[in-house]
């Protein structure tokens, strides 16, 4: 049986929104620090496989649709806002499901962190650059990391739930 935060059919929304707010805060603070420290495209090697850099992503994950002409800014902003509404609804209904709600809170914080970038700058600020030799993974940020961790936890929670139903 799932651990609960409350006895009601739903759960408290505030703790999950608090987690999302923490994600947004750390995401935005790191982006501001990078913007104040680095010139566009500049790279600072921290380890043989990790750099800090400043990249503008006008598209979505991995630069998808980055050169589409500008409409994608508003499409991805609308998608992020739509995801926010759906996630808030799910958190309100299922807030007592801790792992499910944690995963959604991380995804929500990450999505809103990138929506804020699109609204303020017209693009997303990416700065984490992992590489092996000359091969570089696409640069990303803390919001992207929160979305990824949230998605992995969401899959894990669903697999655990399905396995428990057998």
UniProtKB/Swiss-Prot annotation:
Membrane-spanning residues: 10-30, 46-66, 71-91, 100-120, 135-155
Pathway assigned in UniProt: Protein modification; lipoprotein biosynthesis (signal peptide cleavage)
Disulfide bonds: none
Species this chain originates from: Burkholderia thailandensis (strain ATCC 700388 / DSM 13276 / CCUG 48851 / CIP 106301 / E264)
UniProt cross-references to HAMAP family, sorted A to Z: LspA (MF_00161)
Underlying gene: lspA
Molecular function GO terms recorded: aspartic-type endopeptidase activity
Identification of the protein by name: Lipoprotein signal peptidase
Taxonomic lineage from the root: Bacteria, Pseudomonadati, Pseudomonadota, Betaproteobacteria, Burkholderiales
Annotated PROSITE patterns: SPASE_II
Catalyses which reaction(s): Release of signal peptides from bacterial membrane prolipoproteins. Hydrolyzes -Xaa-Yaa-Zaa-|-(S,diacylglyceryl)Cys-, in which Xaa is hydrophobic (preferably Leu), and Yaa (Ala or Ser) and Zaa (Gly or Ala) have small, neutral side chains
EC number of this enzyme: 3.4.23.36
Classification via InterPro entries: Peptidase_A8
Keywords, alphabetical: Aspartyl protease, Cell inner membrane, Cell membrane, Hydrolase, Membrane, Protease, Transmembrane, Transmembrane helix
Annotated membrane topology: Multi-pass membrane protein
Active-site annotation: 126, 144
Family: Belongs to the peptidase A8 family.
Gene Ontology cellular component list: plasma membrane
A biological process from GO: proteolysis
